[in-house]
Amino acid sequence: MKPFWKTKNFQIRWKEPLGKPDCPYAFRYVLILFGYSIRIHVWIRSDDKRYLHDHAWNFRTFVLKGHYFNVSQNNDIIVREKVSFTAFRKADHRHYVEVPKQGCITLLFCSRPYRKWGFWVDGKQFKRPLKYFHKFGHPICSEQ
């Protein structure tokens, strides 16, 4: 999706659907200033649960409405952490977001991107998003 407004050091993205166009799992609102970003995510359902993903930047998230579960892995143990107020995540934190039926709204303050992000297939193989979705497709809407 093209930005609503964009210059070299400034960008606005408004109501970007995340996931499949016919059933997005969230809508994203983004303000980017000199590489730093402020994002609002309106979560409708969970993101892709098949494999964990990481991010390009560190971020602090604040829950504005509802709550979500941050699902990550510590060695071979799956860790499901309820986030109802705030959490800080490093870019290399591997996780997926599990959202209850009532949805959730979050506010994120993000550092400048400093690495590539992607999915970790079987916890080992790094796949960039386009290659990941090309190989595995998007999850079925009812399975999110």
Stretch-by-stretch model annotation:
Residues H41, S72-N74, E98-V99, K116-D122:
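A short secondary-structure junction signal
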Residues W117-Q144:
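Active-site or metal-binding loop neighborhoods of secreted/extracellular toxin and effector enzymes
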Residues V71-Y96:
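Short acidic-glycine-tyrosine-enriched beta hairpin
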Residues K20, T86-A87, K124-P129:
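Internal intein/HINT superfamily modules and their associated LAGLIDADG
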Residues K90-K116:
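Ligand-binding loop in jelly-roll beta-barrel domains
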Residues D54-F69:
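Short, conserved beta-strand element in jelly-roll/cupin
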Residues M1-S37, I77:
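A short, N-terminal "cap"/entry segment at the start of jelly-roll beta-barrel domains
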Residues S37-D54, K90-D92:
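Conserved short histidine dyad/triad with adjacent acidic residue
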